Design a protein with these regions (language model features):
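Alpha-helical transmembrane segments and their membrane-interface boundaries
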Residues: 1-293, 298-341
Length: 341
């Protein structure tokens, strides 16, 4: 059995087609965000980003199969974002967000597990809901949220399928779906969905109850280890999350300290997501070095009133809280006959 230490430092080969995926993701994120900068509505960037995350799905499929997969994933992201915007209008949003985030985690995890989504799990749906719900909003913000996230998701589907006509003309066969990227395909969808829901709710209660500024990062981090089902793999993924996040916080501090123009921030954010797609299949910690500054740049762009040091500190602390809770849930609910790591 490969040791935990070896798994932590293993760098796998670049997956086939990763460069094209990165380009599609980069363009899908860049264009909607630049449009918002141009019309002077950077406060809507969260809605656009989460719609654009539709481009992360369906990479292993072509033609109609990709459209269907991205359409389903996009609908889940649109729904999560709109739910977040609704909760954001409530004066009790901090506590209301916890059970709703748990429900989002359960439903998205089950659908992902049942249909073999890549990337797996409910990470992006929980992220979309909880991040949007954390920013105070008015009822008048609901229409922009619905319009922006929907158009952004549709644009991502368009970008992801522009080559379909060429492939069909060349009679390119649909590739066989690859193995599950982090642990293999599994049955028992409701068990894994319940794990995610429990982890999200527990992390939300602890982070919110302790008065930390942005509890949604703890909820998102709790999902991360539970995206795979073997506890040794969960431990490696959790450690990757913490290690990569803390290195990424240094990168984020350097970028945020520069006080860059909004358009420059958008280009950097899209490029960071593209780099993420190039390295996430090789080593998850590498991906977090890109994801962490990306997330912080977008949050700061949408809500620039948050002090940078507070933003960085909350991210680090909540990541540790969330990963710890996710690992505890994974360990407590592991199969009784599971081999020790």
């Amino acid at each position: 059995m490969t040791s935990i230490g070896q798994r932590l430092v293993t760098v796998r080969p670049l997956p086939p087609g990763a460069a094209w995926v990165a380009v599609r993701v980069w363009f899908s994120i860049l264009v909607p965000l630049l449009v918002l900068v141009a019309i002077d509505h950077v406060e809507w960037t969260l809605y656009a980003v989460f719609g654009a995350f539709t481009s992360l799905y369906g990479r292993e499929r072509v033609d109609l199969h990709r459209i269907v997969r991205q359409g389903a994933a996009g609908l889940s992201l649109i729904t999560a974002t709109i739910l977040g915007a609704l909760v954001a209008t409530s004066s009790a949003r901090e506590w209301l967000a916890i059970p709703v985030a748990g429900a989002v985690a359960v439903v998205a995890s089950y659908v992902s597990e049942s249909h073999g989504w890549i990337p797996p799990g409910s990470l992006f749906q929980v992220f979309a809901f909880a991040a949007v719900a954390s920013v105070p909003a008015e009822a008048s913000d609901l229409v922009p949220a619905i319009v922006v996230v929907t158009l952004s998701a549709l644009f991502a589907v368009l970008v992801g399928n522009v080559g379909a006509v060429v492939r069909r003309a060349r009679r390119t066969a649909d590739p066989a779906p690859p193995g599950h990227p982090i642990g293999g395909a599994h049955s028992g969808g409701w068990l894994y969905a319940a794990q995610s829901g429990i982890g999200v709710i527990a992390a939300g209660l602890i982070a919110t109850g302790s008065g930390i500024g942005r509890p949604y990062w703890a909820m998102v981090s709790a999902v991360v280890p539970l995206m795979t089902h073997d506890f040794a793999a969960q431990l490696v993924r959790g450690l990757h999350r913490v290690i990569g996040t803390f290195i990424g916080l240094g990168v984020a501090w350097l970028l945020l300290d520069l006080d860059l123009a909004d358009a420059v921030v958008v280009v950097i954010a899209a490029t960071l997501q593209a780099f993420t797609e190039l390295v996430i299949g090789r080593n998850y910690a590498f991906a977090l070095i890109c994801i962490t500054p990306l997330a912080l740049l977008i949050v700061h762009l949408a809500a620039p009133v948050i002090p940078i040091n507070e933003l960085l500190g909350d991210r680090g602390l909540e990541t540790v809280i969330g990963v710890t809770i996710g690992l505890l849930v994974g360990y407590a609910t592991r199969p009784r006959n599971a081999t020790r790591a």
